[in-house]
Amino acid sequence: MDTLTAIGRWLAKQHVVTWCVHHEGELWCANAFYLFDAQNVALYLLTDDKTRHAQMSGACASVAGTVNGQPKTVARIRGVQFKGEIRRLEGQESDAARKAYLRRFPVARGLPAPVWEIRLDEIKFTDNTLGFGKKLHWLRDSRAQQA
């Protein structure tokens, strides 16, 4: 199994992302439920335009963040660190992402918040189930690396 497939399978089983945005010397982090899109290597989430992180992001911004599980033992620790770009989706792109998101999280049907995409450009996946401290790396430009 290649690196991106392994990372993608794990990301598809999780549901909460933390991301941080930087704007005019200020940092802010946020959490949200997400849907992983393996084809585009992206996370889709809903967040209101009035939130601090959305206002700091504007139409598009660089972000860094994490996705991690909550295992009971160190030997089962798995988690992702990433950097990428967040942008607010519009039109058909937004409609398609919202439809997929609502299939995964039907409770969000009444939420009018816009859909945002975090395009993952670099991923470091720590997977202790493969050996303590085992890391898999993926870069959008090179498509896959392993360390």
UniProtKB/Swiss-Prot annotation:
Coiled-coil regions, chain positions: none
Top-level lineage group: Bacteria
Family matches, as InterPro entries: Split_barrel_FMN-bd, UPF0306
Family: Belongs to the UPF0306 family.
Protein name, UniProt field: UPF0306 protein YhbP
Organism, scientific name: Salmonella paratyphi A (strain AKU_12601)
